[in-house]
Amino acid sequence: FNRWTSQPNDNLPNLPLEDLPAGVTLYPTTYSPNAFMVPRTVFDRVGGFNESYIQIFEESDFGWRIMEAGYEGYILTTARTRHYGFLESGCVPELRQLGIEKPFRTYCFARNRLRFARRHVDLLQVFSIALIFAPLSCVYYGFVAIRNGRPDIAWKYLAGTLRGILDCLKGRPKQVASSVRR
């Protein structure tokens, strides 16, 4: 996570699994994509998932809090998962690639990116994201959505960005405890 732009950072180049450097089976990460294992004690210590994120960034927030608690996270490059439903019928591939293929998800993506930044980065960096990067990304994502015939997606991205900026002005978001049962 780039603390100035809120763009994701990879510890290794964004390569297909087959093209990763030879011998790399574990590499450090703060992100916990679609399948992961965490000891229950660690899950409880960091408070589980923050359910206020709704739909996107909850895994990133969880991974970041694990790192802040002094634990390390790794991606096992030899593990395989099947993730069905990547491109549902009616979805535009370019919008799906950006994570903005559905209106509600788009709203949550734009809003939660700013909430995540407010929770995890310095105030100066939050201002950089909220006042420079978020408006620029709003223009970009809006343009891509309109170019793909989805002005509704553009409006939802704008609405989510504005809500995220307002949330940033309110202060750091609270942790909403996970409802996962013990």
Task: List each language-model region with its residue ranges.
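A short acidic, glycine-rich active-site loop
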Residues: L95-Y107
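Acidic/His-rich active-site region of diverse nucleotide-sugar glycosyltransferases
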Residues: F1-G47, E51
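Non-catalytic, C-terminal membrane-associated alpha-helical segments of glycosyltransferases
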Residues: D122-R182
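Conserved acidic
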Residues: E58, R105, I153
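A short, conserved alpha-helix in the catalytic core of glycosyltransferases
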Residues: T30, N34-G47, S52-R80
